[in-house]
């Protein structure tokens, strides 16, 4: 059996376990990078007390380093799963990525999920690298990860891939537990599940604003969306789904904003989460966009948790 086939078989066996472990709804946030570490520790304890089982953290230019950040948050919590959404493959070589994951899963069994992704051309350029053939590059990177030397205890690091298009989704099914799509409307979840098949894990990010005021909610949504609409991977994915250039312009049409970011009361947010589940998602990680940036980042989650959990 080849390494790739073996990983796929193992992934199918483990994906259902991880779907249950993550729970139906988790949290995705970059807010913690803006807080002192002491406040981030308090945040993860608050998430646990609310009943969430998983927290997804990002990694970008200027953010905390993914493995160090995950280690801090794992140490501060008792049961919470910390997932990287995602760790950038351009930020470290494949050996460092593999062994960072092995270290954390050894220290915190069943509580660390390694999400990795190919990033975006502008970010890669700033790192002095050239972005090209992302699927092929990811495949080669995974080969190098799987062959990485390690003198510590033999442990298997559970991983998912950031995936939007069909080829990366299929690679997620072949070489990982599954996929972590980001910045997608619900129709993408249907497509993702079809490409993955029934076994692999599908963990979808969903942005949300807890506000009934259309002007306030859409303003918060557009602040969030602007940077992503300027990135080809996200823009091209939306075009592939049938959205026009006019929809993508000026922070997004109202129709696109409402498709990418759910807003309203906690019931409206739960309805969007339920639609992702109906279309094949195992886990939906809510990224709650704050309308009051001075308020604690967990305030809105308290209201949402009462409905979605």
Predicted regions and their residues:
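Active-site-adjacent structural elements that line small-molecule/cofactor binding pockets in enzymes
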Residues: 1-309
């Amino acid at each position: 059996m080849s390494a790739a086939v073996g990983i796929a078989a193992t992934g199918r066996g483990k994906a259902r376990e991880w779907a249950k472990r993550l729970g139906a709804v988790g949290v995705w946030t970059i807010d913690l990078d803006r807080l002192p570490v002491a406040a981030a520790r308090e945040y993860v304890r608050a998430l646990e007390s609310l009943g969430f089982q998983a927290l997804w953290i990002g990694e970008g230019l200027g953010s905390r380093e993914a493995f160090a950040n995950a280690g801090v948050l794992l140490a501060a919590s008792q049961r919470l799963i910390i997932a990287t959404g995602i760790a950038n493959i351009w930020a470290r070589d494949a050996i460092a990525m593999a062994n960072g994951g092995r270290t954390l899963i050894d220290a915190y069994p069943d509580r660390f999920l390694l999400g990795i992704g190919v990033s975006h051309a502008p970010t890669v350029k700033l790192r002095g690298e050239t972005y090209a053939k992302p699927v092929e590059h990811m495949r080669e990177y995974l080969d190098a990860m799987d062959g990485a030397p390690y003198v510590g205890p033999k442990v298997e690091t559970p991983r998912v891939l950031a995936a939007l298009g069909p080829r990366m989704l299929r690679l997620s099914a072949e070489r990982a537990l599954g996929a972590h799509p980001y910045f997608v409307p619900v129709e993408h979840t249907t497509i993702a599940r079809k490409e993955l098949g029934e076994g692999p894990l599908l963990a979808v990010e969903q942005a949300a604003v807890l506000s009934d005021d259309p002007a306030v909610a859409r303003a918060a949504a557009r602040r969030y969306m602007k940077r992503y609409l300027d990135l080809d991977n996200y823009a091209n994915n939306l075009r592939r789904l049938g959205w026009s250039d006019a929809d993508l312009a000026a922070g997004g049409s109202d129709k696109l904003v409402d498709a990418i970011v759910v807003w309203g009361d906690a019931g409206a947010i739960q309805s969007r989460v339920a639609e992702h589940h109906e279309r094949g998602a195992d886990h939906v990680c809510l990224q709650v966009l704050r309308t009051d940036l001075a308020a604690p980042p967990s305030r809105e989650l308290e209201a949402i948790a009462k409905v979605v959990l």
